[in-house]
Amino acid sequence: MTAEEVDKESDPAIEDVKSDYDAIELGNENENENEVVSLDSMKAVISRASSELKHENDQGEERDLGSVEKDPILERYHAACKQGDMKTLREMVESKVIDLSNDYDPKERVSGLHWACINNRLSAVKYLAGAGAEVNFKGGELDATPLHWASKSGLVYIVDELLKAGADPNITDSQGYNLLHTSVFSSNIMLVIYVLFFVVDGKEDVDQPDPHQRTALQWATYQADALTVENLLKFNADVKNADDAGFTALHWGTVKGSIPVMDLLIKHGSDFFQTTNDGKNCFTIGKELYSIGSLEASLYKNGFDKNGFPLPQYFSASTGKMLTFFLPWVLIPLVFYIFSKITFFIALLINTIVLVISGLVLSRLVVPSYLLSKRHPILNSPLLAGILSGTIAIAFFIWFTKISILTFTEKPVGNIIMLGFFIGLITLFIGLMKSDPGYIPGTVDHDKVRETIKELLSLGKFDAKHFCVHTWIRIPLRSKYDRDSACLISAFDHFCPWVYNQIGLLNHKLFYMFVVLLEISVWWFLPLMMEYFDELEDYLENRKGKHFGDCHFLGDEDLCFGLHHDTFNFLLLCWVIFQAFWVLCLIAVQTVQMLKGVTDYEFVQINKKLKSNGTTTEDIFSSTPPELMSEELIAELDAPALDPRQVPQRTCFTVCCTLLGLDKLVTMIKSVLRLKSDEPSSRSSHLSALARIPTDYGWKQNLKDFWLLPDTSSPLWRRILLPPKDSHALLNGMEVDYYTLYTLPNATEELV
């Protein structure tokens, strides 16, 4: 990379703004020459940006024409700085071959420290700064310091070292950009967070503008960088600041059409009716740039209609959730009743109408009272939990009012046990819905955050894999961030819509006990229902004088009798058995994962890496210098990017499979077969390392870790049956704190 190329990266939005403008003008010309959209509010920005860009290009051409051959000694020195060749660097500096106060070409004015910084050569930067290189030297066409060069490339470790060496973060380049601006240009959230905590916090103004009155927040919104926007807003960046064209952050967000960014800005009070200098609000800009759909979606998520007015709210959030939860308690018996009383096809038509109307009422009137999202609203509502609980409640009601009365004489023990099962199911279900899955509290103590950042920098692990950019804490092993609760969840397993809760460290044992008890209860309920049909037939024949002929349509006389003479309970039995099949799939997956010592989330991630040959779509924002990189990080960064075309698209069928757990069952079977295969693997060594399960300590130890509490003074039955009360649990037989779990017990290498 030449100095010219580095400098031309100075204003990342110049070409993008120009492209946006050209595209909209071209589109309007093609549609109707008389209806050219006016974007006067942006022309000033574009004109200025274009002239700056033209000026840079003209300068570059003039320099190329007038360039002379460079000093070979200086060339060798700069090459050593770029490559981090410490031996050559020391020889040239200590032998006085290179004068650090004059180590640049007079035409380029780019020092060796500049080159070491932009190439992420931490050792070279430390050496040069310690040897007396000027850390605030302004070089290149834009009079940028090494700090500017490093920050534009998102190099956190280099920025940290330069600041330690006395670099001034308040210096601006010739375009008027300070350290915060250039850090935002990099779109590296780790650098932005570092600058916010070590430079801005309590010292500088987070809204310090550039010469065109654009703040860091406005640049971040134009770049559609939701993570940077989120963190700037946490530092109280002003959403209402306008640049010299009258554009606020939301105006720039509308230009790019990023829903997450606009969502954040609207949540923090952005005025979508505020106009630019030529009188255009966000709605006008959205229509001109075809981003109006994204703006309307962002407004909807914040409770506004497409015109920016508050949506009508018919219920409070708690009432809406209650209605959603209890609706299946009414619909399930109603559907069964209609099928049991009316001819099948007419009943099917009526039930379809009932369900469609109920769905429309639910989605239009009820769900928006607590959930303003058009993406999988059913999965994120308590509806499925209502279906499961409603099924249990109806089954209990039928058992208590009909089955137990007719069958208690013949099966007293079975009915008493069934009562115990119902009590256990209801208790566990309520407990699961209200349980804490293991939320790890974040922090707002800036001193603690700075300590965490310093620690991770010293370990070479300050990236999004080890530091949570949302909660500002170090990420423990086996945890995952949950957007709904805005917390990390320890030993995260999965989100279960059937209990309307996340499953993690503190409730995973309860969840497994619940699904196993649910499966046992279904198969215990089946013979009681069969006995009920038999007793009902005898009762009607003996007491009512009715006679029923033989029926073998279903291969069982009792079932056939239930179909024809107690259709409601027959349909209930079929519905309950259907539930048992998907629960059985879930138990199978959970059991295998328990034996392997892995959570569902970890299991899915392992198999994604296996399926994609180690590729990943996740950006961990790592700028770790080569000398601090671990083998694991090198392998992860070297893996090729995943082709988006290889990512399976979600369809209605895949969503249904997800709800029933069938996708997990198929994945588990394929993964077990792959892991058990004796065929030679064609994968590289780093990929085979990704495929291993680091928490698999053998099935016996894995079972002990899952079921036993670490408190050895408690009775064994309490250790087995009770869930953890805090973050302490067993791992490889050792007590660990999952809130601060950064290494695995007896692990041969540090994984976090």
Swiss-Prot record:
It is a multi-pass membrane protein. It is an enzyme of class 2 (transferase). It is found in: Early endosome membrane; Golgi apparatus membrane. SUPFAM superfamilies: Ankyrin repeat. Residues 9-21, 51-68 have a biased composition (Basic and acidic residues). GO terms for cellular component: early endosome membrane; Golgi membrane. ANK repeats lie at residues 72-102, 108-137, 142-171, 175-208, 212-241, 245-274. The chain crosses the membrane at residues 319-339, 342-362, 381-401, 413-433, 510-530, 568-588. It catalyses: L-cysteinyl-[protein] + hexadecanoyl-CoA = S-hexadecanoyl-L-cysteinyl-[protein] + CoA. Residues 1-21, 49-68 are annotated as: Disordered. The keyword Nucleotide-binding does not apply. The keyword Transferase applies. Residues 340-341, 402-412, 531-567 are lumenal. Keywords: Acyltransferase, ANK repeat, Endosome, Golgi apparatus, Lipoprotein, Membrane, Palmitate, Repeat, Transferase, Transmembrane, Transmembrane helix. The active site is at C496 (s-palmitoyl cysteine intermediate). One of its GO terms (molecular function) is protein-cysteine S-palmitoyltransferase activity. Belongs to the DHHC palmitoyltransferase family. AKR/ZDHHC17 subfamily. This is Palmitoyltransferase AKR1.
